[in-house]
């Protein structure tokens, strides 16, 4: 599976598009807002004389959320500058995602974004910016994988990423051996599943964890080159609170999708061997795994590390004993909404293996499975939010 080509959300504005089914990701951005605002305040106080800030949002995707993060960042900086009685610095805002992302949707949304910036900035016209421009904000798109360098050395002051770092750079390979100096890899043995599960072999657990450590270390090393000393980074993504990578919070949405696929295979609609060959380029990391990677890379210190549970529709959960009693029709309706959210994200990576023609039937079955599960359980995701300081 070529992740660079297939890892993008459903494009456009249709009923199965990411633009219409991304409330969970929007809520995750909101969940990390407090930590982001705190990091920006510390950054602004330390850099009171800087006239221009480099800011990047990594994994921006497309749709209404694509400009939400940088809009929040600009709003926070404007408010901080007002409180600190200083002019708003020029802001170089870079939006990053893979080349397959629908950047045209983002470009079409920029005039509305610029208008919001203008309304919030009383100094807009006095700075010499014309109507229709971005004012002190200069927005650009940077296509490419964030598992590698994207920006010039020491050109960034702040990096943000939400709902992206749970995606891996590639599907993990099987056990790696050396024979006569040649590295040999095998396909991952995870039959009947598309991600880690209770029945996955321990070797699958190992290679998934290793792939995350490799990818996240490359991510940190790349950002350490691009951020100025004292720069900050706030990351939020799907993770887990348990050391066990096969708990419900980290994998059960994939387990139910595998069940839906297997039901199609049993009826001869798709080939079971295609299910055996498919594994999601995804990993829900634990806080301990994050700490290990950050400490090993050595360029960043952890300013804050939090985990927050949300339900499968993105709603906040404030109580550890969270439990909702649902009527059956309500649970099935919830299942349909969850299925549309998942479809908007994973359909582009499923189509090359299973074909476009089966997608409607697949996600109808998936919606029913999710609804039945929601009826008897209260499933949740765990959101990891980490704020990092570039040392030096």
Curated annotation (Swiss-Prot):
Reactions listed under catalytic activity: jasmonate + S-adenosyl-L-methionine = methyl (-)-jasmonate + S-adenosyl-L-homocysteine
GO terms assigned for molecular function: metal ion binding; methyl jasmonate methylesterase activity
Going by the record, the broad EC class of this enzyme is transferase
Hey, what tissues is this thing expressed in?
Specifically expressed to the flower base. Localizes specifically to both the lateral and median nectaries of flowers (at protein level).
Annotated site location: Involved in substrate discrimination: 160, 238
Required co-factors: Mg(2+)
Q: Give the InterPro entries listed for this entry.
A: MeTrfase_7, MeTrfase_capping, SAM-dependent_MTases_sf
Q: Where does Mg(2+) bind?
A: 190, 276, 278-279
Which one GO biological process term can you cite for this protein?
fatty acid biosynthetic process
Q: What keywords appear on the UniProt entry?
A: Cytoplasm, Fatty acid biosynthesis, Fatty acid metabolism, Lipid biosynthesis, Lipid metabolism, Magnesium, Metal-binding, Methyltransferase, Nucleus, Oxylipin biosynthesis, S-adenosyl-L-methionine, Transferase
- EC number(s) for this protein? 2.1.1.141
Write out the pathway annotation from the protein's UniProt entry. Answer: Lipid metabolism; oxylipin biosynthesis
Tell whether Transferase is among the UniProt keywords.
Answer: yes
Q: Where in the cell is it found?
A: Cytoplasm; Nucleus
- Any one cellular component term from GO for this entry? nucleus
* Binding residue positions for jasmonate: 25, 166-167
Give the cofactor note text.
Answer: Binds 1 Mg(2+) ion per subunit.
Principal cellular location given in the protein's record: cytoplasm
A Pfam family found in this protein is: Methyltransf_7
The entry assigns this protein to a family as follows: Belongs to the methyltransferase superfamily. Type-7 methyltransferase family.
What function does the entry list?
Catalyzes the methylation of jasmonate into methyljasmonate, a plant volatile that acts as an important cellular regulator mediating diverse developmental processes and defense responses.
Name assigned to this protein: Jasmonate O-methyltransferase
Organism the protein comes from: Brassica rapa subsp. pekinensis (Chinese cabbage)
The organism's lineage is: Eukaryota, Viridiplantae, Streptophyta, Embryophyta, Tracheophyta
Q: In the UniProt record, what gene is named as encoding this protein?
A: JMT
